[in-house]
A protein has these predicted regions:
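Conserved N-terminal beta1-alpha1 strand-loop-helix module at the mouth
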Residues: 1-85, 90-118, 134, 144-147, ...
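A short, flexible beta-alpha/helix-coil linker loop
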Residues: 125-127
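Glycine/threonine-rich flexible loop motifs
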Residues: 129-131
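Short alpha-helical segments enriched in small residues
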Residues: 136-139
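Short hydrophobic "strand-cap" motifs at the C-terminus of beta-strands
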Residues: 160
């Protein structure tokens, strides 16, 4: 599964970037605006949510369990220092998607055991979007982690962190 995580870069902001990837065929968008105010997040989130719905794409909000319902999002993605998955599940219920960030096999197993619907494993390589970056995994680290995790779980895992269009086969 290809998951687009919004990031202001060059001529694209969250809205134009979302529109571009949806027009290109992506059907999973995570709205990530780490330094935005709640009002900005709501404003941009409403537009991104409408775009996702018009393309029948999954719309995930990063970190903000409290805004999932207000934005009509399909779910939330939680970092390792965010609200625990089990607590988010109690708030959102079983119908919402909850993703969790992991950097190790132990993190992956903990996310699976706590009720996450998918795992974002990373970072793949160095990224400028995180201040306190976990150890970079690279392709070798991903292969090792996935081999060990697949012995325990079949939960979907997506690669995150520093991935560019050049990493995606045409």
């Amino acid at each position: 599964m290809l998951q687009f995580i919004t990031h202001c870069r060059g001529s694209h902001n969250e809205i134009s970037g979302t529109r571009a990837v949806l027009e290109g065929g992506c059907r999973w968008v995570q709205l990530r605006m780490k330094d935005a105010s709640e009002s900005e997040l709501l404003s941009v989130g409403r537009t991104v949510g409408e775009l996702c719905r018009s393309f029948d794409a999954v719309f995930i909000v990063d970190d903000h369990v409290d805004l999932v319902e207000a934005l009509g999002a399909d779910g939330v993605h939680l970092g390792k220092n965010d609200m625990p998955v089990a607590e988010a599940r109690k708030i959102l219920g079983e119908s919402k998607i909850i993703g969790a960030t992991a950097n190790t096999v132990a993190d992956m197993c903990a996310a699976a055991e706590s009720g996450a619907d998918y795992i974002g494993l990373g970072p793949f390589r160095f990224t400028t979007t995180k201040e306190r970056l976990s150890p970079v995994l690279g392709i070798g680290g991903y292969r090792e982690a996935m081999a060990a995790f697949r012995e325990k779980s079949d939960l979907p895992v997506v690669a995150i962190g520093g991935i560019t269009a050049a990493d995606i086969p045409a």
